């Protein structure tokens, strides 16, 4: 094969450098590179000294077509052929011929042949070209960053979708772009979006947000675990009762030895783990979203994790959707801090979810719901249920009493009226079968009793003794009312006073009044634990050791009548 020596700069298009632009030095016309050479009749000629005018290109095309299809073998004369080197074959056999390219390993031999043909035929085109634009140029990024992201000069006029990403019209000029265009990742957000999302640092709690992301550890003593069946979203009072039941199952009675194990509770925004204190082995591992409830009852911490039961067969069972609650009971002086840390982890995880998904909190209802913004009140729940409001017609003999004993609903009640405290056995009220202890009497024969004193209500009942038919407007309520008191901290006062288990005074507008506590009621249970026969000091301890208190009360007069401490006066 014979190679033509490079002419001495004849008039025409400028020379084209075939040296790889990715090297440490880019050869120019004035400084030809000698890294690659071809042996020709005129002596060694570097590739940078070769000029690809029309005649040279035509002869190179003919030489390339005359070569065998397999360019992997060495050149017969022992010296490498420039085209052999240009096609990326070198002196070694390529393992993957499809991956070979022109210096930059971007194009194969077929691409080179097509490119040389295009280059040879380009001068014959009749379209006039600006001489200043005939010289090939390296790809340059656009000067206007807001303009078209595509490359400007040196870019192909061919549509972008008409060639593959692994080749280009001028692969020896295609280098790594000076400014690469990168699409923002999916998780990136604009400053406006980040500003609209809740900041992780704004979540209150005992731990720092960064600490919870990495994980914090609290020391505790593991008492034991038990299982309970529960619905998916029971009422808070039900949750507290379940926590109390789990504690009663696991915790040893007072005076007995309580077996316990030293553990570490690991809390993060992903998981809650129970680790052995000595070996740090994971004893229990729960994803954060499976934690259903955390109750701190004094120094006792109850951690409840949800697990779905097997698929139910009947439609009733599928609608009920029972879950298995794994209740872990711990003893720690930092039980309240542990419960707060888990709650803070939930808040931070939710804030991270909003930020990562670029969700505006105002559009997904991150504000507290109406039900959560109002404190729980047992009376209000019953009053809002229209099925509890009914009218009862009692048939009796003229001159016969109704056979009901009435008491006051208590100061602070949402509906101040008379309450049925007892029913005479065999009397007209009991015979009708529609009345029960705890029902609120709002009217009698159309006359309202709401807001009247107990004496006025009793007088209105006595006036209907002469009638044979009496209609009572009632609201069905259980004899025991549940009040829920929520405080930001245990140091905040409850807002009521207790004497011998009876609420004797109430702070107007306090947490107790908002939760449904009423003066004159006797406390029956505190957080699921009966206090009927409990000493006064112990009752005060139960009321002050937790931030959220669930109290079951009933009118003290009703309690005395039901326990036989007083004799009822039937009307």
Swiss-Prot record:
Compositionally biased spans, kind Low complexity: 98-115, 155-171
Signal peptide per UniProt: none
PID domain segment(s): 214-378
Composition skew (Polar residues), residue ranges: 122-132, 178-193
Modified residues annotated as Phosphoserine in this record: 168, 369
Segments of this protein annotated with the region Disordered: 1-48, 67-195
Tissue and organ distribution: Ubiquitous.
Compartments where found: Cytoplasm, Perinuclear region
Domain PDZ per the UniProt entry, residue ranges: 391-477, 482-556
BP GO terms, sorted: chemical synaptic transmission; in utero embryonic development; protein transport; regulation of gene expression
Superkingdom as given in the UniProt entry: Eukaryota
GO molecular function: enzyme binding; enzyme inhibitor activity
Presence of the UniProt keyword Membrane in the record: no
Keyword annotations from UniProtKB, A to Z: Acetylation, Cytoplasm, Phosphoprotein, Protein transport, Repeat, Transport
Residue list for modification N-acetylmethionine: 1
Pfam family, one: PID
GO CC annotations on file: perinuclear region of cytoplasm; synapse
InterPro entries assigned to the protein according to its UniProt record, in alphabetical order: APP-Binding, PDZ, PDZ_sf, PH-like_dom_sf, PTB/PI_dom
UniProt comment concerning the protein's domains: Composed of an N-terminal domain, a middle phosphotyrosine-binding domain (PID/PTB) that mediates binding with the cytoplasmic domain of the amyloid-beta precursor protein, and two C-terminal PDZ domains thought to attach proteins to the plasma membrane.
Quaternary assembly: Binds to the cytoplasmic domain of amyloid protein (APP). Interacts with HIF1AN (via N-terminus). Interacts with NECAB3; seems to mediate the interaction between NECAB3 and HIF1AN.
Main function: May modulate processing of the amyloid-beta precursor protein (APP) and hence formation of APP-beta. May enhance the activity of HIF1A in macrophages by inhibiting the activity of HIF1AN.
Protein name: Amyloid-beta A4 precursor protein-binding family A member 3
Source organism: Mus musculus (Mouse)
Phylogenetic placement of the source organism: Eukaryota, Metazoa, Chordata, Craniata, Vertebrata
Name of the gene encoding the protein in the UniProt record: Apba3
